[in-house]
Amino acid sequence: MQWRTAVVKNKSIIFADMKIMYCIRGLHNSGGMERVLSVKANLLASRGHEVSIVVLRLKGRKPFFPIDPSVNIVDLSAPYLSLPGHPSSANATSDSPRTTVSSAVGIASSPATGSARTESSASPVSSAAGIASVPATGASERLKGSVRKRLSRVVEMLDPDVCVSLCGPEVRILPAVAGGRPCVAEYHFSHDKFYRKYGGIFMYPYAWLRTHMLERAVSEYDCMVTLTEHDLPIWKRHCRRVERIFNPVTTPPGQVSRLAEKRMIAVGRLEDQKNFKDLVSAWSIVAERCPDWRLEIFGEGKLEHALRSQIARLGLTGSVILRGVVKDIASEYSNSSALLMTSLHEGFPLALVEASSFGLPLISYDCPTGPSEIIVDAGDGGGVGNVPAATLNQAAGNTPNGYLVPVGDVRTLADRICRIASDDNLRLRLGAASKASSHRFTPETIISAWEHLFSSLL
């Protein structure tokens, strides 16, 4: 067993290399949860831990975000499974994750053409997902039965030191099949997620039921990890131990923005929760006062058509642009001058964290939960005065780095946007404070906190 020393909260902690197993519903989506898991898994693997990701329904689809070749990926929906050290793993390609699965009995997809190959193939073929398909005749484990039975068998074969659920369907069964191993529930949403998602008097009982089922499930875990201080006392009523660990910055280090481009961006799914219609409405005011500035929104979702119609109706074509999903979001941050967010609620807004690492001023609705733990509001007067950037870097913890706006207050939102657009000095000062505050979210800081938690459970 290998031992290392890391610094957590200014203390030197000795860690042993661990076998860590994550469970998640899917990896093919471009959401924040998938992005964060890929970053954490890659970092933990680079620090000597053996990391496995059990995916409930990958179905041969390619993970949206890159996964390190040393990370095991197990597709629980596949009929065959081969694990590290298993004879059928020997033929896996060097650039594929160590765990190999088949997406269909005896059929693999060629990475170049996507064409099918039959089970008569001499060796498995690495798919576009970086997952090698195991022929039906290979010496591999056949996965049968319910999800519970499949997960139990996978835990037995992987033999992890600690099991982590991202609170998908597996959250109710993982402790029962973990064989006494420490289990951690990691929740990426606010406690009241279901009440907000299923609003209205008729759906209230269903929201209560979903919330109650989750509370009951996490009560069986050794630790619950939440993203915000706001939710700590709530979860402590339902789980024996609760910790708050921020999400890390998930974008690769890049060029800090010069804040010179007359361009602001928003990032997120085009869905009701993100509430981009308010942002577009606010921009109709901004476009009159600051006509040479533009807004670009990155994301996709069911409301794309409605947003395009709103943009056209308000005469904002060319001023507000829907850019879809991009994998290199880092370059977009580097070439923008502010990050805008109008969510109705959040778990922990990853876009704000990412943008702060590129030195962008942040403007957000003060929704529950998360923004107020990332943004220090500059107030009506700008709040920063003529404080030099060097001083801001030393006092990042409580130095204004943007604006918090009451939810639904479109006019105030537009006013705050115009302030940053029209005042170069204010924009630079807020950006410097934003960059300085981002040290709390560096991957190294966050991964050390996770290592400390895992070690304390062993």
Where are these regions (language model features)?
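N-terminal strand-loop element at the rim of the active site
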Residues: C23-S30, L43-G106, P111-G138, I234
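Membrane-proximal helix-turn-helix segments that form the acceptor-binding/catalytic region
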Residues: S152-R153, Y204-C223
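Short His-centered aromatic/hydrophobic patch
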Residues: S165-E170, Y187
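Carbohydrate-associated surface elements
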Residues: H230, P248
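Conserved acidic donor-binding segment of nucleotide-sugar-dependent glycosyltransferases
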Residues: V376-V410, R419-D424
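A short, well-ordered alpha-helix in the C-terminal region of glycosyltransferases
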Residues: N401, T412, R419, L426-R440, ...
